[in-house]
């Protein structure tokens, strides 16, 4: 925790002061141009890889950068509610679903229910990608390296998501 507190203090002293006007504007209103849906993995830093500044990306981060099917629900729906907000309130221009290599969430998609029983919420979350995983398994040639298979899975899932996400704008 000490490292975090020192980082916050240094940010206030250095970064905040050198970008005071930007943060003043962001304090009044946000107008991100892009909804960025990415993995919670600590190695993925969206602002760093996209070279964007505070206020440019509206971000959703979750295990395996999954976008569950859109539906009205009484349950908590963090990802879909953030998409609604970005599309209907913030009027973002673009939506990016960003996968990455060596994703633990994508690797967990290939585990048995028994292997995931100690993380039941993650297991349930990954169920949202079960249909896509099965489709990929039929299309991927046997012997395909795991990383390539995972990348194909991510791409197919992103394709599956386009229609439900796009239908929000209409």
Q: Where do the model's predicted regions map?
A:
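Divalent-metal-activated hydrolytic enzyme cores
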Residues: 1-32, 65-93, 104-170
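N-terminal low-complexity or amphipathic/hydrophobic leaders
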Residues: 27-46
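Structural motif
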Residues: 33-36, 56-58, 93-96
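Short beta-strand segments
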Residues: 37-39, 61, 98-100
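Gly/Ser/Thr-rich loops at beta-strand to alpha-helix junctions
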Residues: 41-43, 100-105
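Catalytic core of membrane glycerolipid acyltransferases/transacylases, capturing the structured
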Residues: 43-66
């Amino acid at each position: 925790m000490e490292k975090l507190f020192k980082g916050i203090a240094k940010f206030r002293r250095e970064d905040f002061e050198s970008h005071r006007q930007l943060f003043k504007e962001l304090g009044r209103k946000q107008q991100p141009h892009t909804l960025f849906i990415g993995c919670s993995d600590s190695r993925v830093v969206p602002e760093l890889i996209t070279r964007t500044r505070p206020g440019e990306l509206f971000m959703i981060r979750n295990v395996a950068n999954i976008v569950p099917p859109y539906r009205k629900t009484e349950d908590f729906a963090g990802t879909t509610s953030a998409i609604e907000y970005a599309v209907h309130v913030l009027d973002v221009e673009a939506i990016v679903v960003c996968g990455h290599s060596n994703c633990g969430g994508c690797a967990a998609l290939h585990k048995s229910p028994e292997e995931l029983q100690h993380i039941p919420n993650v297991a349930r979350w990954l169920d949202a990608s079960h249909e896509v995983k099965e489709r990929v398994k039929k299309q991927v040639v046997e012997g395909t390296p795991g990383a390539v298979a995972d990348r194909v899975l991510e791409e197919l899932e992103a394709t599956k998501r386009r229609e439900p996400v796009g239908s929000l704008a209409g």
